[in-house]
């Protein structure tokens, strides 16, 4: 992408990037769920999600610094320095910087992929990083937790069999429905600067005011991960509780006119939505723990892939014409959160009944 010159080429390459990166998130989910017990997974998934939260916080700081510090430089508004090709006299230098940036980012990704290939262990049953005794211990601790453990002698099933078992599992579809709600509501994060600017802040200050939103969310994600592992049998209720918080904030923010109050509600709502994400993934992974490894891999991939389809419609929830109240967007999020409360409360009841029987 560093060298392309047309929109069509950009779309084609972005599609390829999506194809090549499609296995990353499901792979992370499978890796974590393959090594840790059910009551150990929420904290690990929280660390995984917190990386995205931190990137949002640093992104706000960088955008604010550039927007404010570069204001008027070379005759350009500060926000224009966040983009490329907006001034003919600077086009060549900006294209060079963009090219170098993309090359560096791409090269760093490739280098880290090679490092990860040697650093990341395989499954507990066949990793060469552990001794025979350590492998037996790793498998036995998972067997004690999940009721079974897969060794090298365990019969494998085909990809078609795994897919068939996955799509026939009612547990998978409950988790897909719940995760679609969370991802769809979490597209709110795309509009943080726009929403904050609508509360009366300048464009520069709006970028910096996004940082506390992510900072509070970062803390809440960690706390939720801790309690998700401390009380693993009520993860569904923990998720439902956070969705109730976000639902309440989404409703109240539609009728509150004070800028400070709306900002505080936005912070709390964002914290609730981010906190449900990691907990929902660990809930799904632990729920699928009794499945064969191949089926669990497909099931986690389906939850991640179908759940993220919600980003398609989520990107249209806050059109410019709805500012500054954005009643449509917050109303839809409130509705999705309400449905999510029902889904995860139902999941809690059904899964506990399934375990007892």
What are these regions (language model features)?
Residues 9-23, 31, 261-279, 283, ...:
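Hydrophobic core of transmembrane alpha-helices in multi-pass small-molecule transporters
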Residues 38-52, 72-163, 328, 334-357:
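Central mid-sequence intracellular linker of multi-pass
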Residues 52, 209-217, 303, 307:
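Transmembrane alpha-helical segments of major facilitator superfamily
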Residues 2, 6, 18-26, 35, ...:
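Small-residue-rich segments within alpha-helical transmembrane domains of MFS-like 12-TM solute carriers
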Residues 1-11, 19, 33-43, 50-87, ...:
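Extracellular/lumenal inter-transmembrane loop segments of multi-pass membrane transporters
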Residues 47-52, 178, 298-306:
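Hydrophobic alpha-helical segments of secondary membrane carriers
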Residues 236-252:
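Structural signature of the two symmetry-related core transmembrane helices
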Residues 161-226, 236, 281, 312-315:
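Extracytoplasmic gate region of multi-pass secondary transporters
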């Amino acid at each position: 992408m560093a060298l392309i010159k047309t929109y069509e080429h950009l779309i084609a390459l972005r599609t390829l990037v999506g194809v090549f990166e499609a296995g990353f998130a499901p792979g992370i989910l499978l890796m974590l769920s393959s090594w840790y017990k059910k009551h150990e997974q929420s904290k690990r998934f929280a660390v995984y999600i917190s990386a995205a939260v931190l990137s949002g916080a640093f992104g706000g700081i960088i955008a604010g610094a550039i927007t404010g510090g570069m204001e008027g430089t070379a005759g350009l508004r500060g926000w224009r320095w966040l983009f490329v090709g907006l001034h003919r006299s600077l086009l060549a230098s900006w294209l060079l910087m963009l090219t170098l940036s993309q090359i560096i980012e791409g090269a760093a990704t490739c280098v880290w992929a090679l490092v990860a290939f040697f650093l990341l262990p395989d499954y507990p049953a066949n990793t060469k990083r552990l001794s025979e005794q350590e492998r037996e211990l790793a498998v036995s601790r998972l067997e004690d937790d999940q009721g079974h453990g897969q060794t090298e002698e365990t019969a494998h099933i085909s990809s078609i069999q795994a897919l068939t078992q996955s799509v026939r599992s009612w547990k998978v579809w409950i988790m897909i429905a719940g995760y679609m709600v969370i991802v769809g509501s979490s597209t709110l994060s795309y509009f943080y600067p726009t929403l904050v600017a609508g509360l009366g802040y300048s464009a520069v200050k709006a970028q910096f005011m996004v940082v506390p939103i992510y900072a509070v969310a970062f803390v809440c994600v960690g706390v939720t991960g801790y309690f998700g592992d401390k009380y693993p049998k009520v993860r569904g209720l923990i998720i439902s509780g956070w969705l109730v918080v976000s639902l309440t904030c989404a409703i109240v923010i539609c009728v509150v006119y004070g800028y400070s109050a709306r900002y505080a509600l936005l912070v709390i709502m964002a914290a609730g939505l981010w906190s449900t994400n990691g907990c929902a993934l660990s809930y799904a992974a632990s729920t699928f723990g009794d499945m064969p490894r191949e089926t669990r891999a497909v099931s986690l991939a389906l939850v991640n892939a179908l759940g993220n389809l919600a980003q398609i419609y989520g990107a249209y929830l806050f059109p410019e014409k709805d500012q500054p109240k954005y009643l449509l967007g917050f109303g839809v999020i409130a509705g999705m959160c309400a449905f999510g409360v029902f889904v995860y409360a139902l999941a809690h009841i059904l899964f506990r009944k399934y375990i007892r029987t």
